[in-house]
């Protein structure tokens, strides 16, 4: 029996403040500790450049935890201190898709990951 810890990533779209925005995320992932995962969030109804995309997660039995997002005032992506060095958030404006990549995965990274605007 394989007793290796596996990390489950579930992704779901959070309702944004823009009434017509739809966010469609990639599906669930199972990863081993030490690996990395990249999840996507496709925007429709608006273009990605019109929005400020953020990523949050919710571990089992825990509250929502903000991971980072785009700061339109600075024009930069900012990350929560806890995730700096492990998370990268990017955007492909040609496809209106945002990405969040988390590396060096740990068992405590098991969570539902949300994109939100």
From Swiss-Prot:
Keyword match Ribosomal protein: no
Cysteines paired by S-S bonds: 41-115
Signal peptide positions (record): 1-19
PROSITE patterns cross-referenced by the UniProt entry: IG_LIKE (PS50835)
Localization of this protein: Secreted; Cell membrane
InterPro entries in the cross-refs: Ig-like_dom (IPR007110), Ig-like_dom_sf (IPR036179), Ig-like_fold (IPR013783), Ig_V-set (IPR013106), IgHV (IPR050199)
Superkingdom field: Eukaryota
Region (Complementarity-determining-2): 70-77
Region listing for Framework-3, in residue ranges: 78-115
Region (Complementarity-determining-1) residue spans: 45-52
Source taxonomy: Eukaryota, Metazoa, Chordata, Craniata, Vertebrata
Protein's job: V region of the variable domain of immunoglobulin heavy chains that participates in the antigen recognition. Immunoglobulins, also known as antibodies, are membrane-bound or secreted glycoproteins produced by B lymphocytes. In the recognition phase of humoral immunity, the membrane-bound immunoglobulins serve as receptors which, upon binding of a specific antigen, trigger the clonal expansion and differentiation of B lymphocytes into immunoglobulins-secreting plasma cells.
Protein name: Immunoglobulin heavy variable 1-24
Region (Framework-2): 53-69
Keyword Electron transport: no
GO biological process, one term: immunoglobulin mediated immune response
GO molecular function ontology, one term from the record: antigen binding
Ig-like domain location: 20-117
Region described as Complementarity-determining-3: spans on this chain: 116-117
Entry GO CC: extracellular region; immunoglobulin complex; plasma membrane
Subunit structure: Immunoglobulins are composed of two identical heavy chains and two identical light chains; disulfide-linked.
């Amino acid at each position: 029996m394989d007793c290796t810890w596996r990390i489950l990533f579930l992704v779901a779209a959070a309702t944004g403040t823009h009434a017509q925005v739809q966010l469609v995320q990639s599906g669930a992932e199972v990863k081993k500790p030490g690996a990395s995962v990249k999840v996507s969030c496709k925007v429709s109804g608006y273009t990605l450049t019109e929005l400020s995309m953020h990523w949050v997660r919710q571990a089992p039995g825990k509250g929502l935890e903000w991971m980072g997002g785009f700061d339109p005032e600075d024009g930069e992506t900012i990350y929560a201190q806890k995730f700096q060095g492990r998370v990268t958030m990017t955007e492909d404006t040609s496809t209106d898709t945002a990405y969040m990549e988390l590396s060096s995965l740990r068992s405590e990274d098991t969570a539902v990951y949300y994109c939100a605007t």
